[in-house]
């Protein structure tokens, strides 16, 4: 969901509303999880915040002219679906589905299909972007160079317990490390050929997926800004923008 702010040209918006609301149990909390089935609250986080409390600029998003896609995992097939977002407010359920983490989120229904987090089936959609015709790719990673995911000894048992009706989903979610590591290998290969520019942190980030410490968010944000100030000339060279 953060990515839409690039196209709406609203820098610091994601940082601002996360710092403002991360301590609010209506935003994300175990209270929300127990009462609604979603750790990240559907109504407050995905509707009230962007529509009323920190308004997302849909007009600027549309005027950007840049195609924007989200990746979701079809829970019936275990396959990724790539959904083009033309109107953020009208397609909020697709955005929500793309980040619906297993166990702490309900399955999201969108246009007759049932979805969960797209990162389970295609964490790094390199092949999809190449198939769209892009010959130069920029990938933003959250892990340092050399990182590889390790298999989890317990994840398959847990997924089988909670998603026993969806064996294809259980299989792809349990083997996420395999798909992720293959994508990283492809990224590194494309870097060597000059077809891909990877932006990655210099070290492991001390922040969790459901992080609620505003100081950690601020520190990582500032670190990212400083890194890109140092890297911008290299990125422009890669793009041929001299």
Question: Each PLM stretch: what is its role?
Answer:
Residues 1-50, 84, 89-97, 141, ...:
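Patatin-like phospholipase
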Residues 7-9, 155-158, 214-217:
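Short, hinge-like loop/turn segments at secondary-structure boundaries
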Residues 40-63, 177-182, 186, 198:
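C-terminal domain-closing interface element
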Residues 55, 122-123, 184, 214:
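Structural motif corresponding to alpha-helix initiation and N-cap regions
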Residues 62-140, 145-156:
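Active-site gating loop/helix substructures
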Residues 152-173:
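Acidic, Ser/Thr-rich peripheral helices and adjacent loops at domain boundaries
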Residues 183-242:
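C-terminal helical/tail subdomains of lipid-metabolizing enzymes
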